[in-house]
């Protein structure tokens, strides 16, 4: 998993509530267990018409937002079914950070596990960031995870909270497996302990 330390990128404004996981990645694309290749189908119903052509009025089909790495929405992002394909699709599209007033719990957790930083901010702050994003390609946001601050184009810093353990995992680029493997030496040492460590070792001498 790639480390997340500081991201300066285009943000896409999507002022919509209750964006569910079926909107993020429709069920017909869930047959794969690969984490890559889903980005082209992220928000498929909104991005494409019945003939597979892009809908020009959808934000992620517009410049500069087709290159966005930050997504700003309204409440309850990621509601619906608990498909992990949803953060896979966002990440494969290029999204590394999602900002909203609230998230569905499972989606929120799955974002962290897949290298996406979800940030909760009040709706009025989300509105301000969306206004920044609408200024175009020259209006980029900086998300600094080390300092836990979002820097607006005008230089104003907006602090955000994040769980310390999850922050550590993103800063180090660790998923659950990576976190386990970071303790490989301790695991190996434990595996080589006697199977009944509570039984004292007794040396029996030779009887003469």
Curated annotation (Swiss-Prot):
Organism domain of life: Bacteria
Swiss-Prot/TrEMBL keywords = Amino-acid biosynthesis, Branched-chain amino acid biosynthesis, Leucine biosynthesis, Lyase
The pathway this protein participates in, as annotated, is: Amino-acid biosynthesis; L-leucine biosynthesis; L-leucine from 3-methyl-2-oxobutanoate: step 2/4
Cross-referenced SUPFAM superfamilies? LeuD/IlvD-like
* Biological-process GO terms, alphabetical: L-leucine biosynthetic process
- One MF term from GO for this chain? 3-isopropylmalate dehydratase activity
Signal peptide stretch: none
Keyword DNA repair assigned: no
Sorted alphabetically, the Gene Ontology cellular component annotations on this record are: 3-isopropylmalate dehydratase complex
The cross-references to Gene3D superfamilies, in alphabetical order and at most eight, read:
Aconitase, domain 4 (3.20.19.10)
Under catalytic activity, the entry for this protein gives: (2R,3S)-3-isopropylmalate = (2S)-2-isopropylmalate
Task: Tell me if Lyase is a UniProt keyword of this record.
Answer: yes
Q: Which CDD domains match?
A: IPMI_Swivel
> What are the EC numbers?
4.2.1.33
Instruction: Indicate the family of this protein.
Output: Belongs to the LeuD family. LeuD type 1 subfamily.
Its biological purpose:
Catalyzes the isomerization between 2-isopropylmalate and 3-isopropylmalate, via the formation of 2-isopropylmaleate.
What subunit structure does UniProt give? Answer: Heterodimer of LeuC and LeuD.
Quote the protein name from its UniProt record: 3-isopropylmalate dehydratase small subunit
Recorded source organism is Gluconobacter oxydans (strain 621H)
